[in-house]
Amino acid sequence: MLVTGGSAGIGAALAEGFAARGAVVGICGRREDKLAEVLARLQAHSPESRSWRVDLADLDGIEAFAAQANEELGGVDVLVNNAGIPKRRTVQDLTPEVVESTMAINYYSPIRLTLALLPTLVERDGHIVNISSIAARLGPPGEAAYAATKAALTAWSESMAVDLRDTNVGVHVVNPAVIDTELFQMPDNDPAMIEDVEALPTDAMVEPVLRALDDGTFEVYVPEHFLAITQGKFNDPTAWIEGTKAYARSRD
C-alpha cells in the first residue's frame, strides 16, 4: 500500500497502523528526516516497507513516481491520498495564485496519482482512500480555498465510486474534523476557529479507516457524531450559514 503525506500526522498514523497489521507500506513526503523516523517504526513491524522523498506539488513528476512506487512495492493494492496543505484565509485576502496552488496540491495531485495507479488498483481489486475533511461538508469560516479542494476531492470520489461499479475497487472518503496535527500550526495561515472542538490524536483515524476497508463503507467521519451535524446542515443550509456567521462574528 502507498500512503502520501506519510512523514507526519494522519499519514504517519495510518501507515503505522497498517504496518502493525503486517502490511508492506510505502510512504512519501518532502521531509527526508521525518520520513526516516516513520520508516524505522514501520520496518519494526513490516521490514519490506519503504519511503520516497517526493514533492507532490510537482504535478509533472507524479506519473514517474507512481511507476517507481508501484514497481518497488510489487504493486499497489491500497492507495491513501493523504498529502495536503491548509490555507486559512478569508476570501477577501485570497489571490487566484493561492487558490490555484492549494487546489494543485490538495486536488490535482491525488487525482493524478490515482489515475496513474488505477490500472494496477483495478487489476488487484484494490482500494482508494481519499482523506478529505469535514470542511468539505461544512465550509468553515476562513477556509474557502481549503474547503473547496476537499469538496472537489469528495465529489470526484463519489463519481469515481460509481464509474468503477463493474470492478472490485473500493473507494472511500474520510472526513476528519480536528485532528492534532501540524495542519493547525503551519505558517502563512490565519488562526483556526477550533477553540470549541476537541482535537483528537492522530491514531484515532486508524480503526475507522481499517473498518471502512473491511466493510466497504464509502464515507467515514472522525469523530462519528459529525455525520449528524452534517445531516443537520443539509436539512437547512440557510440556517447553517446564518449560524456560522454568528459564530464567526463572536470570534472576530
Segments from the language model and where they lie:
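Conserved glycine-rich cofactor-binding loop
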Residues: 5-8
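Residue(s) in the substrate-gating loop at a strand-loop-helix junction
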Residues: 133
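Substrate-binding pocket helix/loop in short-chain dehydrogenase/reductase
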Residues: 90-91, 95-100
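The beta1-alpha1 cofactor-binding region of Rossmann-like NAD(H)/NADP(H)-dependent oxidoreductases
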Residues: 32-33, 53-65, 96
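C-terminal helical subdomain
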Residues: 173, 189-229
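Active-site helix of classical SDR
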Residues: 114, 149
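Conserved glycine-rich Rossmann-like NAD(P)H-binding loop of the short-chain dehydrogenase/reductase
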Residues: 21-38
